[in-house]
Each structure stands twice: as structure tokens, then as C-alpha cells.
Amino acid sequence: MERAMEQLNRLTRSLRRARTVELPEDNETAVYTLMPMVMADQHRSVSELLSNSKFDVNYAFGRVKRSLLHIAANCGSVECLVLLLKKGANPNYQDISGCTPLHLAARNGQKKCMSKLLEYSADVNICNNEGLTAIHWLAVNGRTELLHDLVQHVTDVDVEDAMGQTALHVACQNGHKTTVQCLLDSGADINRPNVAGATPLYFACSHGQRDTAQILLLRGAKYLPDKNGVTPLDLCVQGGYGQTCEVLIQYHPRLFQTIVQMTQNEDLRENMLRQVLQHLSQQSESQYLKILTGLAEVATTNGHKLLSLSSSYEAQMKSLLRIVRIFCHVFRIGPSSPSNGMDMGYNGNKTPRSQVFKPLELLWHSLDEWLVLIATELMKNKEDSADITSILLKQKGQDQEASCISAFEPPGPGSYERLSTGPGESKPDVLAGKQEASADCQDVISVTANRLSAVIQAFYMCCSCQMPPGMTSPRFIEFVCKHDEVLKCFVNRNPKIIFDHFHFLLECPELMSRFMHIIKAQPFKDRCEWFYEHLHSGQPDSDMVHRPVSENDILLVHRDSIFRSSCEIVSKANCAKLKQGIAVRFHGEEGMGQGVVREWFDILSNEIVNPDYALFTQSADGTTFQPNSNSYVNPDHLNYFRFAGQILGLALNHRQLVNIYFTRSFYKHILGIPVNYQDVASIDPEYAKNLQWILDNDISDLGLELTFSVETDVFGAMEEVPLKPGGGSILVTQNNKAEYVQLVTELRMTRAIQPQINAFLQGFHMFIPPSLIQLFDEYELELLLSGMPEIDVNDWIKNTEYTSGYEREDPVIQWFWEVVEDMTQEERVLLLQFVTGSSRVPHGGFANIMGGSGLQNFTIAAVPYTPNLLPTSSTCINMLKLPEYPSKEILKDRLLVALHCGSYGYTMA
């Protein structure tokens, strides 16, 4: 009966308290019953359960083998913690990581738990498996209020962890000022090194902790490197911690010059150096001038080393340009509170800002001397070549042919062997001396061109940073004009110099024109790399299509109204962010990523030429599109043209191909290349043939009575539109017919769609600068935007006709097709463009190629062979005029020269 009553009482208590009132006998089961109560600090319940139990309060459980005392200390359950201690819990028991309850209380800032643990003899000097004591944990988290209590129980405030780090090390690293002061007040060793030789100051600088570094220096901390020679300043600069560098310089002024010299260290990231020097320069005008003067001196020293042929070109070139870039960056930033461009310089004199460039004048003077010397030698060699030519002519008795020989052309092979002996025996020695001098000059150019070009690049950067944005320095323009011949000699000898050092051409249209013919002669691939290198310069993200961090940067478009919704969103988007990356999501769909971006561009490229928007019309060949002169029927047509330009610019910026091809004339408009009468064929082939007829025939006695005006339909009424002022009264004659053809071409191809072109270019240039896109011609621009189409050579052969004496079985024709089969896909496209004016095969293959009067098969016509003759073409009739070359090798060489050099209208090379 008594036992039954006891069970009933236990049942009642359990139901009232909604828990068990007895612990299981098994420790593993019991501990998981107690743990939630300990975490909630339900000390009465824990006490009741423990009172009638044999539970081991030091029982370790779980993966990390902690006791309930660890749990209480970790959670701040002070009442349960005291209860467990009274029940005999061990305050110094270590879990699997070596942590005691005191470690956990210190880490989490449980002050009351720490106090009780210390009362029950918790050992503050116990280290965990990493060598950390409780004092380390307090230092890591900046628990200064607890540290005061704990240090009274610590026997050694400089106790080290496994890496030899004291609490002061970690407090300095984490920037806890009051903790650092407390440790120092408690006797911590301010210069104590860890196993790597790193002091607390080293640790403070490694994380840019300005305030803790200042406390240490104020209290006499020594400036010491670690065992590898890395100094606190090195760490500050590596991290870009300008404020901490400033503190170091305040206590150790000699470090200022060290920072300037660090610009030569290629292992240091340039952007970190910029951050440091930018911060220092903004503190005062005097410091700003001091930094710039120091950088100018270092740049001058490095520049002269670069001009020394015994130095390493690659290393010195990179060093010079790096220093100059930093110099220009700091110069543009300037101090926060400039003193009207003047302040006391570090030498005690009033120093205008322009004076910081003075040390560099020595380098520019050396550069000028080098270029003048080379120019002199080049001129001397030209004179020597003229002397050699004169000698040869006299020896051969051919003075009457002198007018046929170039004054600057050196003698050809075998010239010296044909010289007579006897009285003129010494002549070859004279000529040999002159040839050796010429060879020496060329050798000098070979070894100096890259070095001098790198210094020229540095000179341009320094000139530019003194000019307003968008303006070219008159001094630099004068410099290039003065040394024009030598610079062209450099790039002719080594065209790669353009891409390596002549970046100024992209920013100076007035100079670009001088070198454009050389640039255009460079391989398409090299120009593409140069294009994208400068297009993306300054952009932080190398992965061009990525998911932006912010949801606001995602272009959310509606699939059922993709053109209009995309137009609205792109017009409002931040252009700078769009240049860095694009993320697109279709409304109601989860998909994102590069595949969605590609789909977006593909759909939009089709929508741009959708007839519903009336923006573009199909050309005569049915494969390309031209701006619609009647697009005004759509009230928003100019906004849409601007959007079309943005889409093509974005696609080019992000290397995304568009599924659309335009007429050759429209690509010319994008490039700023004037159109010609042949471009008219894309919209009116018959009219183009008429213009061709006028040019090909004498119109003097035909009585055409044409004037410099045309009749055009303006809203249903015929009006006379002058091609130039007073054109209605100016007759077209044999002498001015070329001007007439050009003006009427411009009317049809440009003036009629000028507003549309302007709107398109406004959008396109938001992402693609005009100076960059001019690196290409209209054929190359098409490849950049739309990619390279596949060409079926068998279909090409099947649908080719032969004329003027050629037949399919002729050796020249067989050689031709063998060469075509061996061509790369790019070269085949160039051949197709060369002959037809288009890089695409129309739907249905070569059988559907259009000419000026309708369907016109690809045709190969025979031309009599003369040495060096190049193939030519007539694009209006898709005809390749192929000379009857004597061998396959010559045919291949001449054909590739024509394709890569663009022999449109030229027949010799």
C-alpha cells in the first residue's frame, strides 16, 4: 500500500511539472535529460533530480566529451553551475579540445560563471590543445571587464599558445584597445616575439589596427621584423592600411622614404600601394608634394636603368610603368585641403604642384636624346643608301636609269659581285662600311625600341595626368610629331610595340591617324586582345557575366514583352554595373546564369529586326538589315534605336554573339567610315549599277542634264532635295561626277537615316568607346558581333561557275579549292567577304547567293598572270578575278595576302 502511494505521488509530481521526477540510472540517458534544464538554468529541477540520484556530475558526453559544468559555463547558467560545483563537478576537466569550463566562460564573456569557477579553484593557466588559456580567449574577444578580475589569478600574463603568441599578441591583432592597455598595465612584455619572431606591433600592423599600434608605439614598442625579415610596415602596405602606416611614420619618420621605395617591389599589389600613398598624400599639402617628388625621383632612376641596355628589360619596364601609374594616381587625388596649389615643401621652400615633375625632366631629356640620335642615324643611312645607288649606277654606266631607282632603296642581292675590279677595287670596302653602319643602326633599333617605347608610355602618362579628362597634352603631341619617323620605324620593325606601349593612340585621335595603317595591318586576333584589354581596364571583375550581389542589379524582364520590358529596364540601369556584369531573370522563372544571358541576347537580336517595330528593313540579298528610313511611323523609334545600340554594345562588351547581320554600310556608320556607291547595292542594286555606269563611262556628250539634286517622296509629295548648297543649279559633268555619286550615296545611305544612326550610336557608345571600335573594319566588326558562320566547302564548289577561260578541271582551279579546303574557318569567311561582300551564306546554301540583279552564283574568272599580281573581286556580281598562277604555292601566297591585307581596288603588292 505504501509503495503504491509513493508511485502515485511521483506520478502526480511528474504530471504537475510536466517532466520526469527521477533520473534514469544510465548516465548517458540521464545526462540528456538534465542538459536542457542546465541550459535553461532550471536549478531547482536539476537539484531535485540529482538529490535522489547516483548520477556522475563529471560524466563526459557527446562528440567533444564535455560535462554538464561545461554546458552551464558556456550558456551562463550560473545557478546550475554553482549547484554542479557543490555536487563535486571538476572545474578543471578538459574536453576533447582541451577546453575547461573556464575557457568557455571566458570565450563567451560569462562574468558570474568565471567568478564562481575561480572560487572553486579553476586553474587559469591551463592551456587547451592550441595552447590557449582563458586569458587568450578574453583577449581575442576584448573582454576587458573580465580581464581585470582574471589577471589577478594569472601567474604569467605572457603565457604562450602553441605558436608562441601571448594574450597581448591576439588583443593587438583584433584591435581591442582597452584590453591591450590592461595587459600592458599588468606587465605584459610589449616586445615579446612569437615562434616566428613576430611582436605585438607586428600583429597590430598585420590587420591594420591603427589604435593598438599607436598604443604600443606610445609605450615604447620596438620596430622589429620577424625571422623572415618582414617588417610591420611591409604588412601595413600589403594590406593597404594607410592609417596604420601614418602612425608608424609618426614614430619612425625614416619609414616614409621606405614606402616610396616600395613602389619598385613587384611582389606588392599595386592597388594596396595606391591606397596607402593616397591616404598619406591627403593628410597635408607638404606630405602630398613630398610623396610625389619621391615617386618622381624613383621613377627617374628606374627609367634610366631601363635605358641602360645591361638591365633586364622586362623587370625594369614593369617597375617604371608601375611607379608612374602610382605617381599619376596620387597626383590626381591630391590632399583633402589643398592650399591653392602651393604649400611648404619638405625642403622648406614654396613648391608649386607642377614642380613635382621636375625630377622626371632628366628622364624625358634622355629619351629625347636617344630618339634624336636614332633619327640622325636613320637619315645618315638613307644618305648612304643614296651614295651606294649612285656608285652602282656609275659602275654600270646606267646613269640614264637613275630616275627609276628609289633614292632610299639599298642595293639588291648580288650588287657587289657585279662591281668591276681594278681602279674601283676599293669601292666594295666603302660600300661594305656603309652597309655595316646601316646594320648597326638596325641593331640599335632592335635592342632599344622596346625600352624607349616603354619610357614614351611613361612620358604620356605623366603628360596626361596634368590635363583635364579627354584632352591630349600639347607637349606630348609635339613630341610624337617631332619623332614621328623614328616611332614609325619602331612599330614597323616590331608591331607588337603598339599593343605593349602605344596605348596613347587609343586616347588621342589626332595621333591615331598617323599609325592607323600600321595598326590595321596587324593580325585581327592581336587587335581583338588589345580591344578587350582596354575595354575592360579598370573593371574589378574578370568574370564578365556573373550574378550581382544585389537583387536590384538583376534585369527582370517579361518573356511575352521582352523587347519593351528590356528597353525600359536597360534605360534605367547603371551603365557601369552593366559593363561589369549582367544577370537576367525572366519574370516567373527561377533560372539565372550565363545560359539565360545568352538566351536574352539571342531573343533580343531577333526582336530588334522584328518588322512590328519598323526599325530595320531587309536588304536586297535578304540576309542583312539596314535602318529603316521610315521608322518614324513608330513614335518611340529613336528610343528603340538607342536601345538597339545599347544591346549591341553590351553584347560586344561581354563577348556575347548576336543572331543578326547588318548591311556593310551600317557597320561603316558604327565605325565612322564613309560609305561609297557600292554600299547602295544593299538597298537598291539597280540604282547602284546606274551609279557604277556613270563612273565607268564618259558622260560629257550624253545630255543627261543631271544636277546636284534629286527628287524624293516626302509624305506623298515629290520634292527636290539639293545634294549640296545650290545643287539644283550645278550640272553634273565628267569632272565632277565622282563627287555627285558620293553625295547621292551619302543622301541615300546616311542623310536619310541620320537620326536613327545617331540614336543607335548614342546607345552603342555607352559601352564601346569610338576610339576602340575604330581598330576594326566593317568585315571584322561583323565577326566580332555575330561570330564566324560555318561554310560548307562542298556546297561552295558545287555552286561555283567559271568564266574567261577557266574550267572546273583546270590545275589553277584545283589548286584554288585545295587551298580553300586547307584554310581556317576565319580565312574562308574572309574569302567569302572578299568576293561577295558578305560573310554569310544565305538560307539554302550557295545556290541562293544574290548579286546585283538577283541570284548570282559565285564565279571565278581567269586573269593573265604577271608577277606579284593579287586576286581582285567584283562584289556586285560575286566574281573572283583569279590570275593564272604558275604554282599552288604562289596562288596560296597571293590569295592570303589579298584576304589579310584587303586588296579592294588594288591589284599589286
Curated annotation (Swiss-Prot):
Q: In which pathway does it act?
A: Protein modification; protein ubiquitination
> Sorted alphabetically, which SUPFAM superfamilies does this protein's record hold?
Ankyrin repeat, Hect, E3 ligase catalytic domain
Its UniProt entry gives the catalysed reaction(s) as: S-ubiquitinyl-[E2 ubiquitin-conjugating enzyme]-L-cysteine + [acceptor protein]-L-lysine = [E2 ubiquitin-conjugating enzyme]-L-cysteine + N(6)-ubiquitinyl-[acceptor protein]-L-lysine
Q: Which cellular component terms (GO) are annotated to the entry?
A: cytoplasm; endoplasmic reticulum; Golgi cisterna membrane; Golgi membrane; nuclear body; nucleus
Q: Which UniProt keywords apply?
A: ANK repeat, Cell cycle, Cytoplasm, Endoplasmic reticulum, Golgi apparatus, Membrane, Repeat, Transcription, Transcription regulation, Transferase, Ubl conjugation, Ubl conjugation pathway
Any one GO molecular-function label of the UniProt entry: ubiquitin protein ligase activity
Using the UniProt annotation, give all residue ranges assigned to the region (N-terminal helix important for homodimerization).
Answer: 1-21
Record's comment on post-translational modification:
Autoubiquitinated.
Keyword Transcription regulation assigned: yes
Q: What are the subcellular locations of this protein?
A: Golgi apparatus, Golgi stack membrane; Cytoplasm; Endoplasmic reticulum
Q: Does the keyword Nucleus apply?
A: no
Q: Where is this region: Disordered?
A: 409-428
- Report activity regulation: Sterically autoinhibited in its dimeric state.
Give me the ANK repeat coordinates as residue ranges.
Answer: 23-55, 64-93, 97-126, 130-159, 163-192, 196-226, 228-253
Pfam families in the cross-refs = Ank_2 (PF12796), Ank_5 (PF13857), HECT (PF00632)
Q: Where is the HECT domain?
A: 574-909
What interactions and quaternary structure are annotated?
Homodimer. The homodimer is autoinhibited and stabilized by its N-terminal helix. Interacts with RAB1 (RAB1A, RAB1B or RAB1C), RAB4 (RAB4A or RAB4B) and RAB11 (RAB11A or RAB11B); in a GTP-dependent manner. Interacts with the 26S proteasomal complex through the 20S core proteasomal subunit. Interacts with RARB.
> What does the record's free text say on domains?
The N-terminal lobe of the HECT domain is important for interaction with E2 ubiquitin-conjugating enzymes.
Described function: E3 ubiquitin-protein ligase involved in Golgi membrane fusion and regulation of small GTPases. Acts as a regulator of Golgi membrane dynamics during the cell cycle: recruited to Golgi membrane by Rab proteins and regulates postmitotic Golgi membrane fusion. Acts by mediating ubiquitination during mitotic Golgi disassembly, ubiquitination serving as a signal for Golgi reassembly later, after cell division. Specifically binds GTP-bound RAC1, mediating ubiquitination and subsequent degradation of active RAC1, thereby playing a role in host defense against pathogens.
Query: This chain belongs to which protein, by name?
Result: E3 ubiquitin-protein ligase HACE1
Q: What organism does this protein naturally occur in?
A: Rattus norvegicus
In the UniProt record, the gene name given for this protein reads: Hace1
